[in-house]
């Protein structure tokens, strides 16, 4: 990763003792939109997830620790269409691990970024192959995850079980309808892909999808909000 993570933090959480490196915290604060308290908190979360900095923060360990980010003011990302993509977005050097700088810089956009920065990050989430455009298949995949996360949240909220096959089939159908609608109105040159500006236009006019279950409703944003 090539990133200096500083000395091991000194914390008493869970019996672990980490020594906080205030110089590193200051550096992270100055290079992101976080204040000192927020940068320190995320510094601690990172070291908790990486076993005190002794183990690389890989995809599995990152996903297991998503709920810890709620204490930092982030929403429940493990129940969102972006949970699986967030690791890829933070891993900017594509070495299949997330270092401290990548971790906090990426979360800085999610927590404190401008609307434009969040839209750009959302575009990258949809652009699964990273070629700078979104295909109908990529758009449909992310829309399907949005529907699935909405229905899962409703199922938990209402204590009603949802058949997995029915959920997948319905979510796939709705995602295809939304993707077809987006490309029909935005892909005017018929090249089968959306640019960032075209995606932005759609996201601003259709900021969410709404899942319904026996009278209950759940809105799911289609971008980082």
Curated annotation (Swiss-Prot):
GO molecular function: calcium ion binding
InterPro entries: EF-hand-dom_pair, EF_Hand_1_Ca_BS, EF_hand_dom, Recoverin
Keyword Transmembrane belongs to the record: no
Record domain EF-hand: where: 78-113, 114-149, 174-209
Example of a GO biological process term: regulation of signal transduction
Chain segments carrying region Disordered: 1-20
Residues bound to Ca(2+) 1: 91, 93, 95, 97, 102
Entry keywords, A to Z: Calcium, Lipoprotein, Metal-binding, Myristate, Repeat
Comp. bias regions, Low complexity: 1-13
Lipid modification (N-myristoyl glycine), residues: 2
Pfam families: EF-hand_5, EF-hand_7
UniProt-annotated binding residues for Ca(2+) 2: 127, 129, 131, 133, 138
Residues spanning the signal sequence: none
PROSITE patterns: EF_HAND_1 (PS00018), EF_HAND_2 (PS50222)
Residues given in the record as Ca(2+) 3 binding sites: 187, 189, 191, 193, 198
Similarity annotation: Belongs to the recoverin family.
Note: Probably binds two or three calcium ions.
Descriptive protein name: Recoverin family protein DDB_G0274781
Native species: Dictyostelium discoideum (Social amoeba)
């Amino acid at each position: 990763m090539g990133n200096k993570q500083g000395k091991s933090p000194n914390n008493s959480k869970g019996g672990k003792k980490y020594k906080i490196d205030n110089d590193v915290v200051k550096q992270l604060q100055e290079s992101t939109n976080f204040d000192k308290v927020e940068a320190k908190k995320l510094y601690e979360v990172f070291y908790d997830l990486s076993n005190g900095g002794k183990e690389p923060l890989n995809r599995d360990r990152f996903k297991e620790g998503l709920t810890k980010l709620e204490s930092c003011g982030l929403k429940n990302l493990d129940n969102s269409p972006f949970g699986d993509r967030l690791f890829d977005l933070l891993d900017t050097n594509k070495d299949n691990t997330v270092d401290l700088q990548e971790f906090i810089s990426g979360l800085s956009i999610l927590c404190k970024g401008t609307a434009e920065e969040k839209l750009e990050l959302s575009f990258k989430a949809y652009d699964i192959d990273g070629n700078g455009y979104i295909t109908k298949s990529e758009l449909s995949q992310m829309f399907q995850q949005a529907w699935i996360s909405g229905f899962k949240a409703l199922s938990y909220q209402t204590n009603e079980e949802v058949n997995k096959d029915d959920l997948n089939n319905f979510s796939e159908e709705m995602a295809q309808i939304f993707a077809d609608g987006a490309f029909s109105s935005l892909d005017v040159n018929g090249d089968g892909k959306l640019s960032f500006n075209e995606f932005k236009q759609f996201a601003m006019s259709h900021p969410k999808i709404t899942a319904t279950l026996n009278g209950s409703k759940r809105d799911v944003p289609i971008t980082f909000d």
